[in-house]
Amino acid sequence: MFKRTQLIKRELFYWRKALFEYKKIWAYIYYKYIFSKKILDKNEILERPVNNSDLSVHILTCHFDFKMFFWSLASYYNAFKIYGQLYIHNDGTLSPKEINLIKKFFPSARIIDARTFANDFENKLNQYPVFKSIRARHFNFFSFKKIIHTFLAADNKMCLIFDTDILWFKNPIDIEEQIKLGCPRSLMQKNNTYKFLKDGAEIDQQLTQFNAGIILYARENFDTNILIDFFQQLNENNKKELHFADQTGHVKCLKNLSALPEDKYIIRGSVNENTIAKHYTAPRRPLFYLEGILVVMSSRAISEGSQ
């Protein structure tokens, strides 16, 4: 969880990007602080009924990213045709008002609170002492919540995880085909992975291409023994290793891992007719508001509410 000073510094960074790189500071202010709130004024439920009980869908959020989380999740329901049980992971900073908004728009969602996770899932955590201990030591790191909480919170056969800075624009055929087959292949977005472990040991070069913005796997392809070994190798004095533990950890422990097509699930470049989803990572976060939500709003399901 971020301290207030860190949040202010981060937002100032985005303002500078909007002003000097994108030359759209006033548009950024409008779309982020005024326009983006309109999604919360809808009277319609945004979720769709679960039609695949073998699938769990996970998204982690916090107070700072709350509006972004709403747009990301609404775009998921608009783009997908297969809907699993939704798990919304609260890092502990969501206000009661924000929790009520989640219940209003996503009434069947299961809300997982990081502050009570150790008690709520005590029996499961006790089965994995290494998970339990590293999670407790580094509770403030988002990465351990993402890889541990999502695995333990649900028992569904398949797990889809995506970040709040992902927007979905078209039906993800590649992902849904795997879901229909039971996920014999694990999928992650393609890009850069942090490459080094303790003492400079380098991860297999073949696996450095993955990004954790989008992850799909079958539980049977999640190797807990490999993940335990990975956690035990982490240099816990290196904040960068801790920050990327979910990304590198998934790369290490998922069997039959493949990358999603880079030209369809993009991180860089503008959205075009081939783009299925875009990951608006921190260096390009202002574009979430300057580009992404405008594309999403062109969809009837978002602009008028899910039917």
Q: What name fits each language-model region?
A:
Residues 2-125, 281-307:
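N-terminal anchoring/stem segment of glycosyltransferases
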